[in-house]
């Protein structure tokens, strides 16, 4: 197996694991979410105890499903958590939809929908005010898009620009790969079109996208989830 995986190679590994019965999609998503929290606490030990506040950005696919697992697990640990959902939950993949429902059932008042595919300026302003306005957010998690993204995120520009404008107000964590970073590098020329990660938590092996976008990834931690 190569030391660095492409998106298609990683998906093939996951499919083989599912087909063999070694793990289900829900189990793998739970492991991924827990591994992000483990990496976060390893990287920022002061966050492992006490009360903290996280904002989770969840996208329309399985990366978003990982985000809902992270939200739920942090909430159970006593964190204040708010989720911004950039998706129609009814169109999410089955396992991601199941984790969306688990989160909403647990904390129905802590999820904010934002327009998909194009975020409205007023929504981005509200996101900025709620996420950064009081200066108390500790962690912003990017669970919008994972590996294999091949199109610019023009509809998300207002959110990405807000994150960059508040770059030093929180610890920014990307799940698998910073959103806006494709396999061959950034999908757009502007630096602010890629989520500004301090920590990127990826699974099983480093990915080609990381190698072609190291300056956007911050610290890269590889977590093993049983594939």
UniProtKB/Swiss-Prot annotation:
Its EC number is 5.1.99.6. GO terms for molecular function: metal ion binding; NAD(P)HX epimerase activity; nucleotide binding. Keywords: Isomerase, Metal-binding, NAD, NADP, Nucleotide-binding, Potassium. Binds 1 potassium ion per subunit. Residues 10-227 form the YjeF N-terminal domain. (6S)-NADPHX binds at residues 62-66, 146-152, 176. Its cofactor is K(+). It is an enzyme of class 5 (isomerase). It catalyses: (6R)-NADHX = (6S)-NADHX; (6R)-NADPHX = (6S)-NADPHX. InterPro entries: YjeF_N_dom, YjeF_N_dom_sf, YJEFN_prot_NAXE-like. K(+) binds at residues 63, 142, 179. NCBIfam families: yjeF_nterm. Belongs to the NnrE/AIBP family. Catalyzes the epimerization of the S- and R-forms of NAD(P)HX, a damaged form of NAD(P)H that is a result of enzymatic or heat-dependent hydration. This is a prerequisite for the S-specific NAD(P)H-hydrate dehydratase to allow the repair of both epimers of NAD(P)HX. This is NAD(P)H-hydrate epimerase.
């Amino acid at each position: 197996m190569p030391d660095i995986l492409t998106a298609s190679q990683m998906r093939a590994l996951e499919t083989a694991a599912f087909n063999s019965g070694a793990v289900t999609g829900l189990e793998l998503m739970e492991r991924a979410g827990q591994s992000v929290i483990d990496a976060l606490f390893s990287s920022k030990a002061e966050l492992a105890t006490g009360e903290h506040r996280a904002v989770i950005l969840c996208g329309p696919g399985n990366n978003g499903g990982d985000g809902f697992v992270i939200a739920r697990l942090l909430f159970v640990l006593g964190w204040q958590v708010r989720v911004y959902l950039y998706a129609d939950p009814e169109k999410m993949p089955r396992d991601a939809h199941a984790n969306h429902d688990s989160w909403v059932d647990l904390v129905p008042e802590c999820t904010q929908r934002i327009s998909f595919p194009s975020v409205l300026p007023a929504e981005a302003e509200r996101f900025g005010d709620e996420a950064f306005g009081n200066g108390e957010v500790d962690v912003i998690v990017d669970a919008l898009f994972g590996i294999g993204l091949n199109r610019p995120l023009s509809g998300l520009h207002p959110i990405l620009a807000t994150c960059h404008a508040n770059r030093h107000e929180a610890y920014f964590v990307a799940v698998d790969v910073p959103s806006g970073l494709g396999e061959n590098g950034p999908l757009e020329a502007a630096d602010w079109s890629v989520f500004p990660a301090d920590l990127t938590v990826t699974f099983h092996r480093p990915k080609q996208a990381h190698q072609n976008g190291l300056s956007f990834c911050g610290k890269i931690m590889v977590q093993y989830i049983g594939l």
